[in-house]
């Protein structure tokens, strides 16, 4: 080891480095069309609780919609089933205890959008598309240069730390109605 290497290893301050890693984006049709009318009614019956003060610059419900409605919770459970099917393992074995921390509804109209953001410590984040109108903007992952144009009844899932956004809805015919949520690993009962 050179003196330079040795001196570098003696540093005590934080260092910042750029890491690039492949991330999984999962797309699944859920076959939950039979719930769409109820889900739309649940979302529309809520107030715009967030008032465009979050990254979502569109109508947005309370953060914990899944705790208020069994139909919404059914979508959350479908998302958890997808995570369980991945058979993730660590040194303790298969990780199979997950929970929905938060879930909300959003309605995007003309000129609505979502700013670039992550979902912090969430293991997985997802968006379920209840209604996707003609010319709706994609879910955009800038770092990967990936534009995902969703379909009705599709759930798109990605790691919570991945930066994503929704570009401004220009010339969109109708409204895009979604549920979104975050899944965490449940260490409480391991």
Residue ranges of model-derived segments:
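Catalytic core of non-heme Fe(II) oxygenases with the double-stranded beta-helix
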Residues: 91-168, 173-190
């Amino acid at each position: 080891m050179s003196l330079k290497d040795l001196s570098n290893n003696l540093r005590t301050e934080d260092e910042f480095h750029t890491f690039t890693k492949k991330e999984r984006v999962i797309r699944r049709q859920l076959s939950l069309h039979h719930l769409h009318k109820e889900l739309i009614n649940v979302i529309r019956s809520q107030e715009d609780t967030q008032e465009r003060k979050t990254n979502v610059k569109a109508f947005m419900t309370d953060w914990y919609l899944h705790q208020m409605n069994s139909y919404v919770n059914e979508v959350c459970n479908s998302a958890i089933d997808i995570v369980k099917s991945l058979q993730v393992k660590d040194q303790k074995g298969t990780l199979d205890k997950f929970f929905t921390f938060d879930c909300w509804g959003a309605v995007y109209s003309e000129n609505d959008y979502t700013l670039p953001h992550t979902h912090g410590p969430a293991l997985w984040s997802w968006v379920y598309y209840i209604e996707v109108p003609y010319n709706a903007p994609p879910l955009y992952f800038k770092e990967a240069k990936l534009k995902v144009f969703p379909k009705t009844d599709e759930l798109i899932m990605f790691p919570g730390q991945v930066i994503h956004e929704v570009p401004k809805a220009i010339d969109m015919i109708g409204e895009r109605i979604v549920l979104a949520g975050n899944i965490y690993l449940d260490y409480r009962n391991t």
